[in-house]
Amino acid sequence: MNEPTRLPRIPRRTALLATGAILLMVAACGQAAVTAPTPAPTRAATQAGATLPGAAAGGPAQPGQASAAGPAATAGSSAGGTFPGGFLVADRGNGRLLAIDRTGRIWWRFPTAGAVPASQAFAADDAFLAPDGRTIVANDEAHEVIDRIDIATGRITWQYGHYGRAGSGAGFLHTPDDAYPLANGDIVVADIENCRVIEINPAKQIVRQWGRTGACTAAAPATFGRPNGDTPLPDGGILITEITGSRVVRLAADGHVVFDIHVPVRYPSDAQLDSAGNVIVADYSNPGSVVRVSPTGKLLWRYGPKTGAGRLDHPSLATPLADGTILINDDFRHRLVIVDPATNTIVWQYGTTDRPGQTANHLNVPDGHEPLPAGISF
């Protein structure tokens, strides 16, 4: 995704657990509760306006919605079985990655001392486990870099981009988003302000590009309008989300357009496909929403309460789970929630609503998530 800023920065995924596929995550950026203008600010920019830990106070839960009060309301609900391996979360405002099980227990975290290059800060907005299970790729749009983290050593071992410097030349990125590790060792990323999606190999060479650098018109497949989502698909294709024009484009492995549709949201973020091939996409706004749209552009479902505990504030990623529920990053309410489309209610939550923090059951602008497979261990 991409937003206004809260950290120094700029401007969100179905878990593809199939063999050879990438474990997708979402993540988008988040910042202050600002309605995206035209052109919309990046998510990183939005995040920059987010509240620091402990600075905000929350209101009471409303009838029919999950309580925001504490771990009991977020950790052991019946919805926990929808991600038996727990999930990876990019807790952007706290500058950390967490692996959390379905009971809310944190069983892995990054960074630890010495993990990040000297003089650099870490503020990942997305993170995805590589198919081989040995590394995690983290996207840090605030600092214009992509990091590969070695799980065994807990250190960054590879970085692409020039830290703190945006650009379009060789080795540069401009507001990168959703960096996904591929089975061949490459990484695919949406380079938002360069209006392109690129595939980068381990030698830091661009080996494939969708769109033309600097050409920011929504006219797929030739050009793309500020793409902020680039979800790899099991068939070798890619699902691209465009901020400009609120469009979602599905490309086949050979690059031809399968569909190119307008989605009924103000600021689309990190579109995913559900098991039926429909598009699930978050509206990075306040109040925000999540919609399901058919490949022909027909609205099938919307979740978007305008008030109360169910209201979303800049949701950046919505991932359809195996049981039909939807896992959502609710960035500026500092929580992850699961919504049941059958009842349009929150049935599970991690994070304390409107209360950012670092302690148990607290997050601070969580901007990315990835459901993990059962039995995973770092």
Could you say what each language-model-derived stretch is?
Residues 54, 59, 70-378:
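Histidine-/acidic-rich catalytic cores in large beta-rich domains
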Residues 36-76:
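Post-signal peptide N-terminal segment of mature Sec-exported envelope proteins
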Residues 25-28:
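C-terminal motif of bacterial Sec signal peptides marking the signal peptidase cleavage site
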Residues 30-32:
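Bacterial signal peptide processing site
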Residues 1-2, 343:
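Generic cytosolic/nucleocytoplasmic N-terminal low-complexity/intrinsically disordered segments
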Residues 3-18:
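Bacterial N-terminal signal peptides that target proteins for export
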